[in-house]
Amino acid sequence: MSLIHRRLYRISGLSSVNAWNLQIREAVNRNDPVESLLLFREMKRGGFEPNNFTFPFVAKACARLADVGCCEMVHAHLIKSPFWSDVFVGTATVDMFVKCNSVDYAAKVFERMPERDATTWNAMLSGFCQSGHTDKAFSLFREMRLNEITPDSVTVMTLIQSASFEKSLKLLEAMHAVGIRLGVDVQVTVANTWISTYGKCGDLDSAKLVFEAIDRGDRTVVSWNSMFKAYSVFGEAFDAFGLYCLMLREEFKPDLSTFINLAASCQNPETLTQGRLIHSHAIHLGTDQDIEAINTFISMYSKSEDTCSARLLFDIMTSRTCVSWTVMISGYAEKGDMDEALALFHAMIKSGEKPDLVTLLSLISGCGKFGSLETGKWIDARADIYGCKRDNVMICNALIDMYSKCGSIHEARDIFDNTPEKTVVTWTTMIAGYALNGIFLEALKLFSKMIDLDYKPNHITFLAVLQACAHSGSLEKGWEYFHIMKQVYNISPGLDHYSCMVDLLGRKGKLEEALELIRNMSAKPDAGIWGALLNACKIHRNVKIAEQAAESLFNLEPQMAAPYVEMANIYAAAGMWDGFARIRSIMKQRNIKKYPGESVIQVNGKNHSFTVGEHGHVENEVIYFTLNGLSLFAKDKHVLYKDVYKEQSYELFI
């Protein structure tokens, strides 16, 4: 019997509106929205008028289809019926338009409703939140309170979504306070949402407090997973692993989400051991065969610099998605193995899997990071073929960054000028490109133009501008932008901004001012800041301040060789050989070695790597003959002496 005949047979005995409603509801419940709408049509043709139970079922079917045309058709029938003012029907209609991304239609229906309950308000709030209209959502929430409608847990969780979307800690804290006043904070579903959102908004401590406040008997697997997700945002693998052990001791059974979030926490070489333990447990529990889990583990191994394990997982996959290919390609690109990344990209095309925007962005980013200009040009020329045209702002931003890092600043500017819809990221990337390539005045000029065109700079924009000021020695301009950032744009300086200012002051020889700035910082200075000061001390031969900077670096990064070598060189340049010997002794005691630096250049599409003091290159004789010839052009004997001394000092520590 055909589908049409079966339908005709089924509806032939329907003799009442309730019978039709039952059939429509069953079709919706078995996720067959098309059948629901066909039944609705046949019901109308049969002379049966829908009632206040029919319309909510049909509205749900339209929402499942996400078809605005169907929504408008059902709404047209509704406004002709006597049930348009029914609060239950009206709420279902608002929800229908919201789920079809027609928030404006939903708002019109909402405004015309003579009666609304908390569910109606929640449906409209959800629409504004999902569409990113945070201001409208909170304005509606205020209106809801003025109308004396009591919010419930759904209201709170809906508005938490807005805070999550905006990554606004202030909004989240405000909704947390509302939730406590309403008494919904004791509900575990609300607490779970708070935990994950606090993590996303950058407040791990508050996420921990909410988790710990949940009674042990009330915690669910979702509670633990929410906390793991918060840890993954910060890359706190060790704390996440400790919490996972506690979860097992309390006899909770981990699920797929548990392992995905835990693996997402282990994204660097230091946490590879924890990542492997998590992976082995996932295998033991049989949750490692899910494609999303495999993709996450591939990403984990790749970012932990274990591309061999990542590739093994990738190769044994029975089926792959675009994400599978992309995370593996990205792993090679991040490591600098562009040849392997490109080979895998070709294999992806050959397999019939179409690369997406993220795939191309991964390749372009890798080319910029490791200076693979020719490969970058090849990808740029073929981006259109894979549906990522030059008018895509994300592609434009990535290409500007890539060409800038590869030294092709004119190509970067050409893309910038031809980007149709520039964003703050576009301007920031171009400014950073100029700063990176030593074209500092152009960077500052472009920043001024950005401000004139009413673009609002962010913290990364100011970082690029301060770097330009530092490298150009523009101390006055640097202070000006540093204060503008705080006073005009309300952006709190981060450690990187302070590092730039320390670098700028150091270059100008104002080491006491730089040290004072560090001491007055609200945050604890990191290795980058002390390193900038130490480098400035080396340039200006200030042993006293250098010792303070070096001591801080020794405490922060006791196994990093660079600060020891820098301090030893400062002592040597000052003729303080006792200090020089003391640093050497400390390095031997702590088994710290300075490995020679490596650089890579690309000639005729082929990468060539060199290390400091290397004598094993196939073109060794030609290279050193050329270098010796170039050294004859060094007119300043002091500069030449410093270069020779620096090479000798490196050899002492290798």
From Swiss-Prot:
InterPro entries: E_motif, Pentatricopeptide_rpt, PPR_At4g14850-like_plant, TPR-like_helical_dom_sf. Residues 605-635 are annotated as: Type E(+) motif. PPR repeats lie at residues 86-116, 117-151, 152-186, 187-217, 220-254, 255-289, 290-320, 321-355, 356-390, 392-422, 423-457, 458-488, 494-524. GO terms for cellular component: mitochondrion. Coiled coil: none annotated. It is found in: Mitochondrion. GO terms for molecular function: RNA binding. It holds the Pfam family PPR_2. Residues 529-604 are annotated as: Type E motif. The keyword Mitochondrion applies. Belongs to the PPR family. PCMP-E subfamily. This is Pentatricopeptide repeat-containing protein At4g19191, mitochondrial. It comes from Arabidopsis thaliana. The gene is PCMP-E1.
